[in-house]
């Protein structure tokens, strides 16, 4: 049995999961967090499910070696491809995945039209289709795949004209179709909230699932008597790409400067 003081592993294809990591640290400040950014293999959204599963297995094994008591897949595409596989491999390990916020969006919409920004992999998945079938029968859902958006966010330049232009091109058709609720279906996209605020009317609700994932992690840790006690926990970072690149982005997206180690698998 893992100890309460053991860390929690959090992974993403890149820096997008930092939006989830921030929610976890806000809700569970005593937890020690391990974050792996698989930047050397980004973007997951354009990779095959088998490729993504293999990456997630490597990272899960690394977290186990580090003594992690739980794992968070802070990536919608990774969850779609790998969460069932990982739960089979590690049946006693608390595992939390991501899914687009279809249920709260369907409840929130007034116009009956919901827009979804997500990766191609997420939107084409059976898991996403099942979410729509379960929660969105009474609303119109318009999906917008966003190739290239993750890569621009990974640069850390959230004010670049190229990023603004690309995002505008993805959002405008959804607004034109009457969307009053917008789902951010990728953990990278919450970093675009300031840009989106200038593109969409004030009455358009923007929904993501970072806070819900943090609450689910708290529930699972509590159910397994694994919630950390005592002093505030720290966060440690690894990347499968150049560590210096992540070091430069952390102050922008994480708002802190931390050391970054190389993850070689």
Swiss-Prot record:
One of its GO terms (molecular function) is glutamate racemase activity. It is an enzyme of class 5 (isomerase). Pathway: Cell wall biogenesis; peptidoglycan biosynthesis. The active site is at residues 75, 186. Substrate binds at residues 12-13, 44-45, 76-77, 187-188. InterPro entries: Asp/Glu/hydantoin_racemase, Asp/Glu_race, Asp/Glu_racemase_AS_1, Asp/Glu_racemase_AS_2, Glu_race. The keyword NADP does not apply. GO terms for biological process: cell wall organization; peptidoglycan biosynthetic process; regulation of cell shape. HAMAP family: Glu_racemase (MF_00258). This is Glutamate racemase. The gene is murI.
């Amino acid at each position: 049995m893992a100890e309460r003081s053991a860390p929690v592993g959090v992974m993403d294809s890149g820096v997008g999961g930092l939006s989830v990591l921030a929610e976890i640290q806000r809700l569970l400040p005593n937890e020690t967090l391990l974050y792996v950014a698989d930047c050397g293999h980004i973007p997951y959204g354009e990779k095959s499910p088998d490729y993504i599963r293999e990456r997630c297995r490597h990272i899960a094994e690394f977290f186990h070696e580090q003594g992690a008591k739980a794992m968070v897949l802070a990536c919608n595409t990774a969850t779609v491809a790998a969460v069932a596989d990982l739960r089979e491999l590690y049946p006693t390990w608390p595992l939390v995945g991501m899914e687009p916020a279809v249920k709260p969006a369907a409840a929130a919409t007034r116009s009956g039209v919901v827009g979804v920004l997500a990766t191609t992999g997420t939107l084409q998945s059976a898991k996403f289709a099942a979410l729509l079938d379960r929660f969105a029968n009474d609303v119109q859902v318009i999906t917008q795949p966003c190739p290239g958006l993750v890569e621009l966010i990974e640069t850390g330049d959230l004010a670049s004209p190229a990023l603004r232009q690309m995002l505008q091109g993805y959002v405008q058709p959804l607004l034109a179709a009457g969307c009053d609720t917008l789902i951010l279906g990728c953990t990278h996209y919450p970093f675009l909230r300031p840009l989106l605020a200038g593109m969409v009317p004030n009455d358009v609700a923007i929904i993501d699932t970072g806070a819900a994932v943090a609450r689910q992690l708290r529930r699972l840790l509590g159910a397994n008597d694994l919630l950390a006690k005592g002093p505030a926990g720290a966060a440690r970072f690894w990347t499968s790409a150049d560590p210096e690149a992540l070091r430069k982005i952390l102050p922008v997206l994480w708002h802190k400067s931390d050391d970054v180690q190389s993850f070689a698998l």
